[in-house]
Amino acid sequence: MTAATLDLAIITGLSGAGRSTAAKCLEDLGWFVVDNLPPALLSTMAELGHRSGGAVSRIAVVVDVRGRAFFSDLRAAVEALDSRGMHPRMLFLEASDDALVRRFDHVRRPHPLQGDERVVDGINRERTLLAELRGEADLVLDTTDLNVHELRAKIDAAFGQPRANRLNATVISFGYKYGLPLDADLVADCRFLPNPHWVEALRPYTGRDSQVRDYVLAQPGATEFVDQYTALLRLVGEGYVREGKRYLTLAVGCTGGKHRSVAVAEQLGARLAADGVGVRVVHRDLGRE
């Protein structure tokens, strides 16, 4: 991996402004996130990413630089990375005094710099200490009026890759006789369709075979079920993406998980893929009979 292909981000800013939330957003976008990394170790972390052979291509570190020594260490680390052709982007998070005071009151914790004084005194002290760092940031986000989802959208816009907001779906066929998949977000029940198991010529085959697939989809209500469930998945998927959820697990069930659920899961997976969803189709119970 070359220096140019390693993407580095530094997350810093005021206490209570959302550093941890921003870090979680980046983690959901596929970044390797390290919390509370001493600035002096930033170059070491970048070198580990460089040596990973592409396994780690995007690294974000949350840095607390309230101490003057840490501030000097961060500046030295950034300069060292710049000299090697690795140019980290710095995100600085801030919020109004009123918003920060409310947040500290809500969690019932003191500000780390307030000492024996008020929360607002600690906020003002930290704001002064970090003023120079704020001026050097590539992106400053004011989170005063942002909820978690709005902050996530801004992080996504700034640090996400193309199609980073794409929904990724796992479609699992299963047999009810073996139990529901524990990680399913949605469950589609195909047992209203006639069972190919009772058609002797089809019994040895599975829903992946054309004979069974064609039989299942030719049954009354089958194509309508696939059409309407696809429409439902589009609606739900769009809502998931708006809410910042990137992964959906759909379980498609029949009695044994061999014929109907397999055929329908394949159809739904193909429909989702055609809509631009990242799809993985898994047939959990094939071969269990």
UniProtKB/Swiss-Prot annotation:
The keyword Iron-sulfur does not apply. InterPro entries: P-loop_NTPase, RapZ-like, RapZ-like_N, RapZ_C. GO terms for molecular function: ATP binding; GTP binding. It comes from the Bacteria. ATP binds at G13, L14, S15, G16, A17, G18, R19, S20. Keywords: ATP-binding, GTP-binding, Nucleotide-binding. GTP binds at D64, V65, R66, G67. Belongs to the RapZ-like family. Displays ATPase and GTPase activities. This is Nucleotide-binding protein Franean1_2060. It comes from Parafrankia sp. (strain EAN1pec).
